[in-house]
Amino acid sequence: MNNREKEILAILRRNPLIQQNEIADMLQISRSRVAAHIMDLMRKGRIKGKGYILTEQEYCVVVGTINMDIRGMADIRYPQSASHPGTIHCSAGGVGRNIAHNLALLGRDVHLLSVIGDDFYGEMLLEETRRAGVNVSGCVRLHGQSTSTYLAIANRDDQTVLAINDTHLLEQLTPQLLNGSRDLLRHAGVVLADCNLTAEALEWVFTLADEIPVFVDTVSEFKAGKIKHWLAHIHTLKPTLPELEILWGQAITSDADRNTAVNALHQQGVQQLFVYLPDESVYCSEKDGEQFLLTAPAHTTVDSFGADDGFMAGLVYSFLEGYSFRDSARFAVACAAISRASGSLNNPTLSADNALSLVPMV
């Protein structure tokens, strides 16, 4: 913030109901300049909205994908090249967007930095994400471009047999485009990035975040390698076993290998590691601290798709709330369980209270 913005914030703290013309008189500037400064403070996340409600709660900035998710489920076990009966479902998606949505459901103040096209999908995604409680003022609309789309096909056993991720638009989320939100990021309590970002955008995040804890979702083994040289800048990492192999650089064939790989990443600077395992259990490891395995609580399962996004949101929420490492892991596992209990990518019943009610079962 510049000095003028700090002066305006100080005035608003003393009198949140003050009029813009009164602020202008106090600072001996025009009312239009006051309005412009207030708009800038809203964009930077220092003012939540109308009424000059100041943001005192630490907020999270999520930098990552927003896309339309199209998911088809065939009625057979082994889909072939022919047309098959089944169901097709479209929903707002994207790793970054899903995590931001879940954080809003948990009650946190969250900002999403991403890019959309100027098409129907883009407009729908922005509106749905805004309605969820996510601040989308940092999402940039690019004219003449199509919004990112994710297409997945599953069999009748709910196993994904093919997925296509058209996120080329994210290549245009450059540091130059992101610079408009640099002050917002610098004041965040936590920054979360997903590995759909370009190497240049990830570098921008890690460099600008500096001392702010950065959480990273590796997304897939095809994209995990982007952060291999940034491990010293990562506070919390949530890889799968194949993604952990990429980051470690060796095959993992046993629990001992997994533990060695985790410790190797700790030595490079990662503070917290949560390895998402195929059976939906999680191996949790804190640098110079605890290491343990958590299993999913007994809970209704409707669709596992997106549960890991619920898990990551739980990690961010519990970190901002000051939970211990073990309690943070337990809370995140509970969030993932609630996410699996819905056919939607973001279970509308996800809340901090509902997650805490499951924690004793974990």
Curated annotation (Swiss-Prot):
Matches recorded under Pfam families: HTH_24, PfkB
Keywords assigned: Kinase, Transferase
InterPro entries with a match to the protein in the record: Carboh/pur_kinase_PfkB_CS, PfkB_dom, Ribokinase-like, WH-like_DNA-bd_sf, WH_DNA-bd_sf
Gene3D superfamilies, A to Z: 3.40.1190.20, Winged helix-like DNA-binding domain superfamily/Winged helix DNA-binding domain (1.10.10.10)
Kinase recorded as keyword: yes
CDD domains: YeiC_kinase_like
Keyword presence, Aminoacyl-tRNA synthetase: no
Regions that span the bilayer: none
Gene Ontology molecular-function annotations: kinase activity
Enzyme Commission no: 2.7.1.-
Family: Belongs to the carbohydrate kinase PfkB family.
Annotated protein name in UniProt: Uncharacterized sugar kinase YeiI
Organism: Escherichia coli (strain K12)
